Amino acid sequence: MAGGEAGVTLGQPHLSRQDLTTLDVTKLTPLSHEVISRQATINIGTIGHVAHGKSTVVKAISGVHTVRFKNELERNITIKLGYANAKIYKLDDPSCPRPECYRSCGSSTPDEFPTDIPGTKGNFKLVRHVSFVDCPGHDILMATMLNGAAVMDAALLLIAGNESCPQPQTSEHLAAIEIMKLKHILILQNKIDLVKESQAKEQYEQILAFVQGTVAEGAPIIPISAQLKYNIEVVCEYIVKKIPVPPRDFTSEPRLIVIRSFDVNKPGCEVDDLKGGVAGGSILKGVLKVGQEIEVRPGIVSKDSEGKLMCKPIFSKIVSLFAEHNDLQYAAPGGLIGVGTKIDPTLCRADRMVGQVLGAVGALPEIFTELEISYFLLRRLLGVRTEGDKKAAKVQKLSKNEVLMVNIGSLSTGGRVSAVKADLGKIVLTNPVCTEVGEKIALSRRVEKHWRLIGWGQIRRGVTIKPTVDDD
């Protein structure tokens, strides 16, 4: 906070001002100017096969390179969830033809700027602020992709124009977003600069055949070249026109799913200058405010002398909120938000808090150690290349005592199947998880050394544990 009165943002003066003292959450909408000026209110995932250009598309739209880690740059693949925010503008001059009247910029760009297109007048005005969740396309990173799907409102499905469609991960990702019930999808036919027109047309037919009968049927297919930034403004236009901003709940107690967490202190920092841990995630509902008391569940997990699991929720206070580089006084549901807390930074370093839920004290859901689920298995394994004409391997039924990987919200944890009948199963979780009855979960099984998506389920009920709270 750059001095001044409490509860008023003063960082980035070119953006809309947020004032906590006059905040009325009942009047906020996902398109309120003071919200979208500083933070994204809609999450769009990028999905598709490895090396089809997902990160490049995000970079073309937002100007942010989502690949942050050295080993990712060297191997040119996304390993962690990347993320980037972009503002989408529309020119207020009606004489300007579409799609040129749409433009995208980084999230700290002013909310209005004059046109630079010859022959037009007026200003580019902010219409949407979107957050991109850039998922890895590698088969071994399917769990990360599912964690990202937990916070998506819509998806961009990337298909490279110079390879046949569908590639293995393309179909696996499409199944994953079908489980997550994502209805809004744009298909981007990328690398169009590398193929002849006839090839592009032929692949267009392949894509149509591939998405028929899936959740992506009828989705617009946009030919683009992410590297040359060709047709990117068309993508912006479609994001504005085809993807509705989901209705948001601003009045409930806030709840945030953590998908990243880190320790922001440099080595050798003086003790007095240490900053608390930072949790990054997407708010599902409610509004978080600077200065608010918060609780993180399940918190610190340990075992007592008898080997029983114990959970100790972490209580803390929000010291700062930010969306990329923009300071916030309050954060609304939607895009990815960084929450600066007073939590011991060692608890947050290197994504240790992923899968936890952060929210108002006393308003978070129960902590489960066992789940009873109704489940549905896929008929065939997806994403595995099969020899020649052989059909993909059938998915075997769940067997008692086998270990599956369970994705709940943004948490991936192991689970042992303790009982199974018809379409109901009981799963004993390796790690306790904070969730609710009715939540969707994804199930994966170890097949030939890789975790493969085999089906999904819904939580019917479960065994909960009471959190232990210190009496101090």
UniProtKB/Swiss-Prot annotation:
Question: Which residue ranges does the record annotate as region G4?
Answer: 190-193
Instruction: Mark the transmembrane ranges.
Output: none
Enzyme class name: hydrolase
Signal peptide from the UniProt entry: none
Q: Which residues carry this modification: N-acetylalanine?
A: A2
Keywords attached to this entry: Acetylation, Cytoplasm, Disease variant, Epilepsy, GTP-binding, Hydrolase, Initiation factor, Intellectual disability, Nucleotide-binding, Obesity, Phosphoprotein, Protein biosynthesis
- Region annotation Interacts with CDC123: where it falls in the sequence: 457-469
Positions carrying Phosphoserine are S16
Query: What reaction gets catalysed by this protein?
Result: GTP + H2O = GDP + phosphate + H(+)
The protein depicted here goes by the name Eukaryotic translation initiation factor 2 subunit 3
GO CC, sorted alphabetically, is: cytoplasm; cytosol; eukaryotic translation initiation factor 2 complex; extracellular exosome
Subunit note: Eukaryotic translation initiation factor 2 eIF2 is a heterotrimeric complex composed of an alpha (EIF2S1), a beta (EIF2S2) and a gamma (EIF2S3) chain. eIF2 is member of the 43S pre-initiation complex (43S PIC). Interacts (via C-terminus) with CDC123; the interaction is direct.
